[in-house]
Amino acid sequence: MKTLADVFREALKEKGISSIGTLSKRFRKSKNKLQDIAIEIVHGKGAVFRVPEKTAVAWDLNGNRVDGSYYAYAPLCMREKFEPVLTPEELREKLPDWPYFIIDLYHWDKHTQKEKGKICLQVNQSYGLLRDYFTGSELAVTWANEEFREMFHGPLDRITTYGGPTSEFLKENGINEVVLLDPWAEEVLSEKDFDVKAFIIGGIVDTGGNKKKTTPKIGEELESAGIKVRRRKIVLRGDVVGVPDRINRILGIILKMMVEGKSMDEAVYEMQEPLHARWRLRKELPKRATRYMVEGKVYRVVEKELFDEYSKWLKIRWEDFVKVLRELDLVALERKRIHHLNKISNARIINGKLHRVILLKRAAMLCYNC
């Protein structure tokens, strides 16, 4: 799927432009200059002009720095001084029909003030993610009441807000089928789902208490209004545990899969925080534990090398690994030491579970022979 930068690049090529600069050296610093310039043009802040002298700073169409350019982005007020080459109207006409990413605030009043603040923050961060790929106006917030508008400190004029139900917003935009991101769904999100014109990615934080399993209810309400709903979940190696639950991070996973072509596991890893990784680590480590019994006391032991294995697909640091070990009362030993323990122990079933019982006399003899 094309990004706004791709569309802008093609528009410049059509005009025979191979590089573009800015009249000010203080233009926003970022990794993707074409995207940032295109955003400002789409929102009517400026245009591309032909200038009589080369600009001090410029980039080619791949974003690489070049010596200068006779084409520059500048505010629209410069129309009287320079010849416009690419205007906001021209660029908007070339924009593809990108899907909406909807945050449904129907359950807004079930949240505490602190949780409402979290929602506003995540909406703002979601806009920041979308403007890295598209224009940002693809982010739609439905059931956007006055309280939300007052609490939201982001660019309200650059996102799409709708005061009514999601179903009405969809119908007004000619959309009759959506993908609902639901951790309780049976099917996993895939490339086949990227043909829809709207994704509903949340609107709920802290899914405990009176908000438990409210996401499926959003789907039921849409279906009752005649909207076809594809319920999909995001998983990491087949399990939802370890998948970020913040609205903006779910959106980031979708964008990395849809636009960058990354696999789901890759996208989840890139958007994961150590907190989410520890959730999954708590589930994985006990599966790899071996029970050793010494003089009636049981120790659950895992290989220390598991850290290297799990860190390939979980965003964990060594301190996260140690923290989970302590929480689960596990002991980590080097693999060679575990092999040694297996030599001096016998396997026995105790209370229906496999234990390795270490015989101290045998251990002493082996150590003596060493």
From Swiss-Prot:
Q: Name one GO cellular component term.
A: cytoplasm
Span of domain SAM-dependent MTase TRM10-type = 87-292
Q: What GO biological process terms are annotated to this protein in UniProt? A: tRNA methylation; tRNA processing
The entry's keywords: Cytoplasm, Methyltransferase, S-adenosyl-L-methionine, Transferase, tRNA processing
Cite the EC number.
2.1.1.218, 2.1.1.221
**Does the keyword Cytoplasm feature in the UniProt annotation?**
yes
Q: Which InterPro entries match?
A: MT_TRM10-typ, MT_TRM10-typ_sf, tRNA_m1G_mtfrase_arc, tRNA_N1-methyltransferase
Q: Where, per UniProt, does this protein localize? A: Cytoplasm
Q: Which reaction does it catalyse?
A: adenosine(9) in tRNA + S-adenosyl-L-methionine = N(1)-methyladenosine(9) in tRNA + S-adenosyl-L-homocysteine + H(+); guanosine(9) in tRNA + S-adenosyl-L-methionine = N(1)-methylguanosine(9) in tRNA + S-adenosyl-L-homocysteine + H(+)
Q: Which residues form the signal peptide?
A: none
The answer to keyword Methyltransferase applying to this record is yes
Please list the GO terms describing molecular function. tRNA (adenine(9)-N1)-methyltransferase activity; tRNA (guanosine(9)-N1)-methyltransferase activity
Q: Which superkingdom? A: Archaea
Broad class of where this protein is predominantly found: cytoplasm
Give the similarity note: Belongs to the class IV-like SAM-binding methyltransferase superfamily. TRM10 family.
Q: What does this protein do?
A: Catalyzes the S-adenosyl-L-methionine-dependent formation of either N(1)-methyladenine or N(1)-methylguanine at position 9 (m1A9 or m1G9) in tRNA.
Query: What is the name of this protein?
Result: tRNA (guanine(9)-/adenine(9)-N1)-methyltransferase
Organism field: Thermococcus kodakarensis (strain ATCC BAA-918 / JCM 12380 / KOD1) (Pyrococcus kodakaraensis (strain KOD1))
